[in-house]
Amino acid sequence: MPFLVALSGIISGVHDHSMTVRLDQQTRQRLQDIVKGGYRSANAAIVDAINKRWEALHDEQLDAAYAAAIHDNPAYPYESEAERSAARARRNARQQRSAQ
C-alpha cells in the first residue's frame, strides 16, 4: 500500500507550495533511513532531492547545448578558427611578457 507524505514549505520564487507524495514501501523505508541518519526532516530530504535532480537536469541541458554549439562551430566559443588562433597568440604573447 502506498505511503503518503505531505510536503509543505517548498519554496518556488516567493510562494510556498504544499503537496502530497505517494511513496512505495521501498522509497518510504529509504526516506525513513535518511531521516534516522540525522537528516533535518523528511520534507527537507525530499526538497533537497528535488533540487539536486533539477541541478543535474540543468547541467545535462547545458552540456547538450554546448555539444550542439561545438557541433555547429568547432571553434566555439570563437566565431572561427582564425579568431581562436589570434586569441591564443595574444594570450601566449601576454604570458611570455609577464614571465620575463
UniProtKB/Swiss-Prot annotation:
Keywords: Toxin-antitoxin system. Residues 77-100 are annotated as: Disordered. Forms a complex with cognate toxin MazF4. Antitoxin component of a type II toxin-antitoxin (TA) system. Labile antitoxin that binds to cognate MazF4 toxin and counteracts its endoribonuclease activity. This is Probable antitoxin MazE4. It comes from Mycobacterium tuberculosis (strain CDC 1551 / Oshkosh).
